[in-house]
Amino acid sequence: MKIVFLDFEKGIEEFEAKIEQLRFAQDNSALDISAEIARLQTKSLGLTKSVYAKLTPWQISQVARHPQRPYTLDYVQHLFTDFEELHGDRNFADDQAIVGGLARFNGQTVMIIGHQKGRDTKEKIHRNFGMPKPEGYRKALRLMRLAEKFSIPLITFIDTPGAYPGIDAEERGQSEAIGKNLYVMAGLRIPIICVIIGEGGSGGALAIAVGDTSLMLQYSTYSVISPEGCASILWKSADKASDAAEILGITADRLKEMGLIDSIIPEPIGGAHRDYPVVMQSVKQTLQESLRKLQDIPLETLLQKRLDRLLGYGRFKINQPD
């Protein structure tokens, strides 16, 4: 798969293009230029490390939206077995922006729920660009209650620009659906692990992100609004998105400092899309550890900690001088 490079990766793209040219030349001639290829690969890797060591929040948001980044169903394919997708909210429709179902993780039955985006134009439209409508959140709610009924741990994958803001979604109760999920998830009598794998956009993300453990991939984002949306409100121009991204504190390290997430899952150099096996192994290992810890905690203690965590969002202290 040919890598799609972002605007700030132009230097890396040039190195990779030269490497591809040399590989093609070597395959079609008797010349041995492997040493030159290795030299360029070393330079490309060094430049990639240098660029990714000092990413701005705006650049991280671009990586979080990368079109080749692994989505929920990619994690399902690599980390779980015997996945059985469950469809529909039993009320209106089967929203394709939310996927979910039963699966096995290391032999243990779990319930999976996650946002799903599309790769090409047709699939993006089919998945509504990863923006769920009320029926998507109600489908998720149905699966949550099913998991609780059978005492099955819940794992959610968050990757959405936000809930769908269309008139039809509002008419069918978008805010009610999101609010109901928050209320129910706060009291679900099962362990819940939430993994932010790409964009964590506002209430559309939070509607499946109330849990006991919140994990976040290194180059993912989590925010009340997109940088572009914030810039449009504050400065009346999306051109200020980079400034907004800095102010919003959307990155994993900032959110960890504020106590809004528990752990940051490292990504390969260049982002998760550069090496699926590596990021899948990192996510698997972190999920294993998190699930084991949660299952050792008494249920009532787990529920109280979850509620305290949810009610603590937005609280902060100001140190005033004497």
UniProtKB/Swiss-Prot annotation:
UniProt entry keywords in alphabetical sequence: ATP-binding, Cytoplasm, Fatty acid biosynthesis, Fatty acid metabolism, Lipid biosynthesis, Lipid metabolism, Nucleotide-binding, Transferase
Pathway: Lipid metabolism; malonyl-CoA biosynthesis; malonyl-CoA from acetyl-CoA: step 1/1
Enzyme Commission code: 2.1.3.15
Pfam families the UniProt entry points to: ACCA
Main EC class the enzyme belongs to: transferase
Segments forming domain CoA carboxyltransferase C-terminal: 30-293
One Gene Ontology molecular-function label: ATP binding
One GO CC term, this protein: acetyl-CoA carboxylase complex
Record's subcellular location: Cytoplasm
Signal peptide as annotated in the record: none
Record field: catalytic activity: N(6)-carboxybiotinyl-L-lysyl-[protein] + acetyl-CoA = N(6)-biotinyl-L-lysyl-[protein] + malonyl-CoA
GO process terms (BP): fatty acid biosynthetic process; malonyl-CoA biosynthetic process
Subunit structure and binding partners: Acetyl-CoA carboxylase is a heterohexamer composed of biotin carboxyl carrier protein (AccB), biotin carboxylase (AccC) and two subunits each of ACCase subunit alpha (AccA) and ACCase subunit beta (AccD).
Family classification: Belongs to the AccA family.
Function comment: Component of the acetyl coenzyme A carboxylase (ACC) complex. First, biotin carboxylase catalyzes the carboxylation of biotin on its carrier protein (BCCP) and then the CO(2) group is transferred by the carboxyltransferase to acetyl-CoA to form malonyl-CoA.
Name the record gives this protein: Acetyl-coenzyme A carboxylase carboxyl transferase subunit alpha
Highest classification ranks of the organism: Bacteria, Pseudomonadati, Pseudomonadota, Betaproteobacteria, Nitrosomonadales
Underlying gene: accA
